[in-house]
Design a protein with these regions (language model features):
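A compositional/structural signature for long, glycine/proline-rich flexible linkers
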Residues: 1-222
Length: 222
């Protein structure tokens, strides 16, 4: 769609890679070693990207929703019935502050999925939140946060991460399956999250209630 930036998340491999990507992207290794760190470990991998309120006040994150167990209330589950044990999306501050303004987990996020299986998650500050960025209008929302969390830092910086935990061996479209930077789309397909920059809340509010998600999906790259 015109004037909409659609950015995919990228796979996390190690801490050095993240710092290099942020400050010296031309030095980023083409085949970084997967050593984990921060939220990445033997059972969890994630993807990430950066946001800035300087460039947009309202973002929408979307991907096809992986199958996860519904057992928040103690329901029993069968491991063969899901793609991964747990998935979540969180916003964050700077690498040093390591703040986490907000998160949403799979059972909450699944409520925003339409009949195509895609979820719609609005990311903004509370004061920028569109009036229709609600569960009643068919979408989820999380707080973007108030900057990088550093003294004299940027009040507009934010990061977003998507976590996959205990992925089923038969599911081949998770962050675990990405072995090289730049292969995320090829590997993850519809499960690769994209962040759409809608810039301001009026543009999202124009999608109505219930939110016309077909117009959001039309903003994604072909």
């Amino acid at each position: 769609a015109k004037n909409v930036e659609a950015r995919p998340l990228q796979a996390f491999f190690n801490r050095k890679q993240v710092v290099t990507d942020l400050f010296f992207p031309w030095l980023t290794a083409k085949a970084p070693e997967q050593v984990g760190g921060w939220w990445s470990n033997k059972v969890t991998r994630y993807g990430y990207t950066y946001l800035s309120r300087n460039f947009g006040q309202v973002y929408v994150m979307t991907a096809k929703m992986p199958r996860t167990p519904k057992n928040w209330h103690g329901e029993k589950d069968n491991p063969s019935d899901y793609d991964m044990r747990y998935a979540s999306i969180c916003t964050g501050g700077s690498l040093t502050a390591a703040s986490t303004p907000d998160c949403i987990y799979d059972e909450q996020l699944a409520a925003s999925a339409d009949d195509t299986g895609r979820y719609a998650l609005v990311i903004s500050r509370q004061e920028d939140r569109p009036g229709n960025a609600t569960a009643q209008c068919g979408v989820a929302w999380i707080d973007m946060g108030n900057g990088d969390g550093m003294v004299s830092g940027s009040p507009h910086f934010a990061s977003v991460i998507n976590r996959h935990t205990q992925v089923h061996a038969d599911f081949k479209h998770s962050w675990f399956a990405v072995t090289q930077p730049g292969t995320e789309k090829e590997t993850m397909g519809e499960y690769l999250p994209y962040v759409l920059n809608l810039k301001e809340k009026a543009r999202f509010e124009a999608l109505g209630c219930p939110v016309d998600k077909s117009k959001l999906w039309a903003m994604l790259p072909k």
